[in-house]
Amino acid sequence: MRVSQMLVPTLREVPAEAEVVSHQLLLRAGFIRKTASGVYTYLPLAQRVLKKLRQIIREEIDKQGGQELLMPIIQPAEMWLESGRWHVYGPELFRLKDRHDRNFCLGPTHEEVITILIRGEVRSYKQMPLLLYQIQNKYRDERRPRFGLLRGREFIMKDLYSFDRDEAGLDISYQKMHEAYTSIFSRCGVKFRPVEADSGAIGGSSTHEFMVLAESGEAAILYCSDCDYAANVEKATTLPAAGLDPAIQQLELQEVSTPGKKTAEEVAKFLGVEPFQVIKTMFYKTDKEVVAALVRGDRDVNEIKLLNVLGALTLDLADESTVQQVTGAPTGYVGPVGLENIRIVADMEVMALVNAVVGANKQDAHLINVNPKRDFQPEIVEDIRMVKAGEPCPKCGAQLLEARGIEVGQIFKLGTKYSKALGATFLDENGKEQPIVMGCYGIGVSRTMAAAIEQNYDKDGIIWPASIAPYQAIVIPVAPKDDNQMKIAEELYKALNQAGVETILDDRSERPGVKFKDADLIGYPLRIVVGNKAVTEGVVEIRQRRSGQTDLVSVKDSVPKILEILPTL
């Protein structure tokens, strides 16, 4: 392909709407254009990258026994009502009506469609295991679409569903997909980590996210400095808290005045104690009740863990009026002692505190020498706190480190959540009806393209890994009007393509500097410059985009040299 014949509308200025690097560079390098908020048109260069991503995904999934199908984007509301998710999914679900006033949605996921399909087609254990997948557009009505392809309202996804007769079979399918995803992202040339995660609205028992590591990542992950443990901050745990120290005497409960001291740090400083000796009491409203959550003063409540512990559908921090109504005191002076008709959920660390400090449920007052079990009894004691870098790894005890990541894939063990809700059953070896055991596995294809850029760029533009670059090499004749230069450039362009190197020829009548800037902006892994030396000395310049290394190579040796370099990029 020749640049003069292509639609590659590069921009010199950074578009005002672009907040993150990938969005800026995808616009500037002519990969995408905005159609509406969170909706983009993919131009030819982007399509080439997406095609390569799809191909890598297909090859690795098919290798594990996957079968590709294609499901509809428009899904009838009846399916979602049957599964119970029509109301759970909330305003992010694009809902629409047809001319007959029937409700539909644009699919953000396809659990309902695939499960109901299998319900009608699979009746025997002999028909499983099954691994069925599609690569399809998905839709989510984001409140505030931003960051280009990283948080859009229309996006491209690969979603796969596994169907097994039992949990042991699901474990095998899950491991197959874990291996496939590891191979996929390795082949894409990105640095990534699989991390333990929360299953969210999809549901299920076990899940891992695949995170591309990037400083601009929206998610924080914690990983062990010694072993393979890694989890996002919503899921991360640490070693269990130490038990009560029997050597410490429990003192008599007392009320003390703490005028104007509301935060754990302010109270601790005023009373001359460490912040960890203060118990923070946070009130939350679920879909059913108001609950009190207790953590140490130097910790924060992990709302995802709390939501899961409560088994609630929704969880929001209670407003000031609710706190006042429940406790009779303003926020900052509330505590668990004397609370009535309120469920108390305590973090495990709280139960190890002796002679702690809590709010007295009275303006400008706190209680000291508070001891769990003696002075208050939580209904639930679980891990409900945020874990931070520097704490010990739950597997080996080494230090946890923090990194930022962009989620590009997630795998779930759904179990029988959807098969039971939707009646997808099979007959086992004994002729007994059993629910099908399911898993689901997603990859954000368009998101992976953006994430790769967030990890691979410099001041001049994108630095594509060779495996997913739109073209692997670009041949640039310095003076296209020089017949001798153009002849060498044309021959080299043809020879590289014949050798299997995806090569583009910049035959435009532009200044060399303009061509070089465009090549760096777009991010071709290799740039081959055909200048006057190619004519007079028979050498061309081969420049590697990532390292900037430049080699002068004879024209006749240039193709073998490029074939040698390419696998390292």
From Swiss-Prot:
Annotated CDD domains: ProRS-INS, ProRS_anticodon_short, ProRS_core_prok
Keyword set, alphabetical order: Aminoacyl-tRNA synthetase, ATP-binding, Cytoplasm, Ligase, Nucleotide-binding, Protein biosynthesis
EC number, UniProt record: 6.1.1.15
InterPro entries: aa-tRNA-synt_IIb, aa-tRNA-synth_II, aa-tRNA-synth_II/BPL/LPL, Anticodon-bd, Anticodon-bd_dom_sf, Pro-tRNA-ligase_IIa, Pro-tRNA-synth_IIa_bac-type, Pro-tRNA-Synthase_IIa_type1
SUPFAM superfamilies hit by this protein: Class II aaRS ABD-related, Class II aaRS and biotin synthetases, YbaK/ProRS associated domain
Coiled-coil zones: none
Catalytic activity: tRNA(Pro) + L-proline + ATP = L-prolyl-tRNA(Pro) + AMP + diphosphate
Protein name: Proline--tRNA ligase
